[in-house]
Every structure is written in C-alpha cells, then in structure tokens.
Regions:
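Active-site mouth of glycoside hydrolases
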Residues: 23-249, 255, 260-262, 273, ...
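Catalytic His-Asp charge-relay segment
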Residues: 276-278
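Bacterial Sec-dependent N-terminal signal peptides
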Residues: 1-22
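Catalytic domains of carbohydrate-active enzymes that cleave complex glycans
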Residues: 350, 354-361
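Catalytic histidine-centered segment of alpha/beta-hydrolase-like enzymes
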Residues: 316-318
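Conserved catalytic-core segment of NTP-binding enzymes
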Residues: 266
C-alpha cells in the first residue's frame, strides 16, 4: 500500500508539472531527426550488462549495484573507441524505491560520462528466462546456459493487463522527465523487440503505443525508438507492430545477427524512410562478426551497437542454444573481454580500434 501511495504521489507531481491536458508532442520530422544524427558522429558501442549482474535486477538494486566494476568495464569500452552503451532498466527495482533507483542510475551516468560514453536507455523487453522474478538475492547463473536468469520487463502478466500499467507510466514519465535534456542520454529505446510474442504476451502493441504516448507527453530532447528484430515477411502476424514502429519512431533501430549480406539488405530496406538508422544489436559469431559487419554499418553511417562486452554472469558468450553443463565454446557468441580484461580475440580488438579510429591516436 505504501508503495502504491508513493507511486500515485509521483504521478500527480508529474501531472502537476506537465499539465493534465498536455497534448503529446508529435513525431520528429525527417529534417529534425537527420540534423540530430549529423551532430552525433558515428554511433558505436555495445549492449551492456555489468559482468557481476545476472539480470537487470542485480544490475540496479542497491544490494548488488557494482559501480567499481562498471567503471572498470567502461574503461575497456572507451579503449575500444566506443561512445555508446545500451542498458536495460528494471521496473521492479524502480517501483520498490524510485529515489534509490534514480540515484544509482545517476551514478552510472556519471561513470559513463567519465569515459566519454552515452546511454541508450531501454524500458521494456519480452525476452527472458527467469520465472517469477523478485527483488533480493537472484538465482545463480546456470553453467553452460546463455542468459539463464534474464527478466521479462514488465513481464507477461503486466503486459497483458492494462489495469497494471499505471506504475509503468509513473516510471517512464519520471525517468524521461528527469533526463529529458541530459546529453548523457543518447536516445530512448522504449520497447525492445516488440515482435517477440513467444512467452504469452498479447498486448505488446497497445503497451508500446501507450509508452510512446507517455514519452511524447514529456517531449524529451532525445529521439524515441523501438527496435525491429528481423525483416518482416508478407506472412508475419507481427506486420501491424512493425508498421507502427516504423511510422512512429523518430529514428529507426533494428537488430541483425545474420550474415553480412542480410545485414546490408536490411539496411537498404530501411533507407527509404530517410531517417537515422541504428543497429542496436548485432555480432553473434560465427555468422555476424565485427570484421564483416562493422564496415557495412559504417559505410551507411548506421549506428553499430554489438551485444555484450565482458563474459560475465549472463554467459552471453555462449550460443542461444547452449545447454546446462555444456563446455566453454572455442568460438564465443557475444562479448569481447574476459573478466580480467584480456580480449577474447586481440585481432578483433585491434580491428574495432581501427574502425573507431582510436588506433591512430
């Protein structure tokens, strides 16, 4: 009850600031979006989960928040020439303690700013293997399993029940309002891979529409987007979702773990939208590699955000199909560094540095 009262007070405070009848801002024009992109330079970086965190809860809750490791890893990212990291938030951590969550998020932003890095902030995602996620001590990593305890946010039950979206609205509006003019935020990724309906989620599109509306009411200086995870076919039931995303995002984001030819085909499909393009997930060896994909992304000035930095608790370096007890693979799937900071492949690291230009400094 205390938590609900606190969240209600937060929403009323936001409403008083914004005005109850405030009309949502409109989608950015092509000219505004492209002018924004021209100011950024080439966007390059990684999807980031702290190596000591098994999921979003462990990354952000007070008991396990690990700024020392974050600082160390952001130093490695800076050394690669990365200027961006994409992070995933936790509604459970925020709702339990909005003030504490925001204090830790602010500390994280201070760390990345120190290393000349900006954040892509992701709110919701339908992917996850952790059943009934709860605050406190998190389940242990399962040896041999890729991303064994990742959390759906906010989860199937909440996504499918609009009466429970009130707390989500509070979170979205509070965080975006706080950072709406903050240069440390590159852009807002409101819903990760909304095409993903494999875990019983039925109201992704309605929730995504509402989340965009909440964000538009705040009208941040940073663009809004949601990434598509594959080229849609004429037979996909997700076409309404894909169409809505591409017609309402300020910038176009997408994911691609397939071969370089497919990546270039995907990019060419999106170019007619005449909006900035950012690939917010790629690089899954052996099909999608830095050496083959980074030059294509840079050629078209498409933002390049590979998945993973350090092979930590999440086991991102293992294949999606890995099973409990599987041995360490000779060929990593994601990630760049081992826990001690040594590269999985020095040749890859040298290539990344060449592509980002830091090898010439």
């Amino acid at each position: 009850m205390k938590r609900k009262i606190l969240l209600t007070m937060t929403l009323f405070a936001l409403a008083a600031t914004l005005g109850f009848a405030k009309k949502p801002a409109e989608r950015w024009s092509e000219e505004k979006a492209n002018a924004w992109m021209a100011e950024q330079g080439w966007i390059v970086g990684c999807d980031y989960v702290c190596a000591t965190a098994i999921n979003q809860i462990e990354m952000w809750q007070a008991e396990t928040f690990d700024p020392a490791t974050m600082d160390k890893e952001m130093g490695w990212a800076e050394g690669l020439g990365f200027n961006t990291v994409r992070v995933f938030l936790s509604d459970l951590v925020y709702t339990a303690d909005p003030k504490g969550f925001k204090a830790r998020f602010e500390e994280f932003l201070g760390i990345i700013e120190k290393h000349h890095i900006r954040a892509i902030v992701t709110f919701w995602t339908n992917g996850g293997k952790c059943k009934n996620p709860k605050l406190g001590k998190q389940p242990e990593s399962v040896q041999g399993v890729h991303n064994s305890q990742w959390c759906m946010v906010p989860g199937t039950e909440v996504v499918n029940d609009p009466t429970k979206w009130h707390e989500l609205e509070v979170m979205v509006k509070d965080i975006i309002k706080t950072y709406k003019n903050d240069d440390r935020i590159l852009f807002w990724c409101l819903y990760n891979e909304p095409q993903n309906t494999q875990r019983g989620v039925k109201k992704t599109l309605p929730l995504m529409k509402e989340t965009f509306r909440w964000a538009r009411e705040i009208n941040p200086s940073q663009p809004l987007t949601a990434p598509i995870w594959e080229i849609p076919s004429s037979l996909t039931p997700q076409m309404p979702t894909v169409t809505w995303v591409w017609e309402n995002s300020d910038i176009i984001s997408f994911h691609c773990y397939k071969e370089p030819d497919y990546l270039e085909k995907f990019i060419k499909l999106l170019l007619p939208y005449n909006r900035p393009l950012v690939c917010t997930e790629y690089m899954g060896r052996p099909k999608s590699t830095f050496k083959e994909c980074m030059p294509i992304l840079k050629k078209y000035n498409v933002g390049a955000i590979n998945f993973g930095l350090t092979a930590g608790k999440c086991n991102f370096h293992l294949q999606w199909t890995s099973k409990a007890g599987d041995p360490e693979p000779k060929v990593w799937f994601h990630d760049i560094f081992r826990l001690d900071g040594t590269p999985y492949s020095q040749e890859e690291v040298d290539f990344i540095r060449e592509m980002t230009g830091v090898s010439k400094k």
